[in-house]
Amino acid sequence: MDIRIIPQKLRGAVTPPASKSMAHRAVLAMALAGGTGTLSNLSDSQDIQATKRCVAALKDPRPEGELPFLDCGESGSTLRFLIPIALAVAGGGVFTGHGRLMERPQQPYFDIFDEKGIFYGQTDGVLTVRGTLTPGVYRLPGNVSSQFVTGLLYALPLLPGDSTIEITTPLESGGYVDMTLDMLEKFGISVQNKNYAVFHISGNQVYQGRDITVEGDWSQAGFWYSANFLDNQVAIQGLNADSTQGDRVVASLYWKLAKPGDADVDVSGCPDLLPPLAVMAAVRSGTTRFVNAARLRIKESDRLATTAALLNALGGHAEEGPDSLTVRGVPAFSGGTVDGANDHRIVMAAAIAATRYSAPVTILGAEAIRKSYPSFWEDYKQLGGVFDVF
């Protein structure tokens, strides 16, 4: 699906969807609690559907010795959270996915599996993992996705003895780990956090069902913050100002970028915010450097490259480095065509940027928003956005 946007200012109120990051964690915790409790305000995004589908597959009866087949869609969280969980509850699993998912690195797990004697093999986009997680010490570098930490934090309490996770280098994505620890605590799981360097997890713990309402998504709210930066008037509702979501930092980064002059923004702890922040940077006075961004190259797209391409296609000035993006501000954009790159965040960033253009903007592959924000185009239209689908 391609969309042609006629530039218009956006005005009104919007409620971002439920937090995808929190929803993944809640769905998994509730499943490990035996399905007791209730879960409300759950996003219907493709990523959450993938986690629910895999949870159901883990519960399905199967012949003795047969591993569950887990289709993770395009969801990195689903895949990385469930690899250790499947080992803990089912002796492993056969994992598959779509898009670039199975190209995304799993080496931190593979290093652990080599040490622990757990089998793994990947052929033609299918990853098979078989073995038993045992209590003990698990080591992870801190400069990789926090999804690896979360997967272990969910699985290790189920083991018959105590375990420790050692973070061997400074942890970059502490906000996402905070979200995990908060959800585990809600479901009765105790973890001792020693300054994000060591996590002590007692074994033989039992997940306890809870009634959970998933709060609004600060990551998706980032696009509406970006809209306001571009002189739109959007009231953003339904967010928890005290949230453990790391992406709530978008509120303070908004004001940092509002100040004229050159600026550096470290996105190691909030990589998903890069596209909307880059749109803000493209129209501000000064040069903005987004640093510590190497992990963005292994998202749904090479997001450093596709964010730069988005801005440059529409008359901006962006240059990618190995782990950075440099954006020089321009007064306005000229319009053009953006390849959505099958990346939901690139599509939404382009739609927001279109409100500052002097000519129509075409976005190719606009349906990618279904991955995380299925109602994005409805919300965009309700706020006064004008577009044609072709």
Residue locations for each model-derived region?
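Short, structured segments at the rim of ligand-binding sites
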Residues: 1-390
